[in-house]
Regions:
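Extended beta-strand/beta-hairpin segments
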Residues: 1-44, 55-156
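Alpha-helical metal-binding/catalytic segments enriched in His/Glu/Asp
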Residues: 49
Length: 156
């Protein structure tokens, strides 16, 4: 995989990767040019990687998922280089009759087998996994049926 960033002035860049070839705006001072900060992209990459795994596994398990979000809350060191020191990934699933065991297995498979971003980052800092399952009820409303901290991935 190859990635290239091109300087656009100040601290703004446009990046492209050789797989998607889609432009991504980067900016050291979010909001100045509308770009994301590099560390934000790492958190987004982690969220996107595990989200794709988990939803794919839930679909294969024929779970009736109507909504799915993954949130990554990453903590950073106070001193430079201000690396990530820990992260919490929260999987938020809405559906009809979504089985807790199916979600737990999907999260486990993503964390231990399929998501390279999570596998790589969990070797550098602890990642705690949490989940919420909401049952979809009438008129687009939903009610929480399961909520839990699941586990912290072991560091190798």
């Amino acid at each position: 995989m190859k990635a290239t960033v091109n300087w656009k002035g100040d601290l703004a860049f446009t990046g492209t990767g050789d797989v998607s070839n889609l432009p991504v705006s980067l900016d050291a001072d979010s909001g100045t040019t509308g770009g994301a900060r590099p560390m934000e992209l790492i958190a987004l990459g982690l969220a996107g990687c595990t989200a794709m795994d988990v939803i794919s596994i839930l679909q294969k398990k024929r779970q009736n998922v109507t909504g799915f979000d993954v949130q990554v809350d990453a903590s950073r060191a106070e001193e430079h280089p201000k690396v990530f020191t820990s992260a919490v990934i929260t999987y938020i699933v809405t559906g009809v009759g979504v089985e807790e065991s199916a979600l737990l297995r999907a999260i486990e498979l993503s964390a231990t087998r399929y998501c390279p971003a999570q596998s790589m980052l969990s070797q550098v800092f602890p990642i705690e996994l949490k989940y919420e399952i909401y049952e979809e009820v009438e008129d687009g409303e939903r009610r929480l049926t399961h909520q839990s901290a699941w586990q912290e991935l072991p560091q190798e």
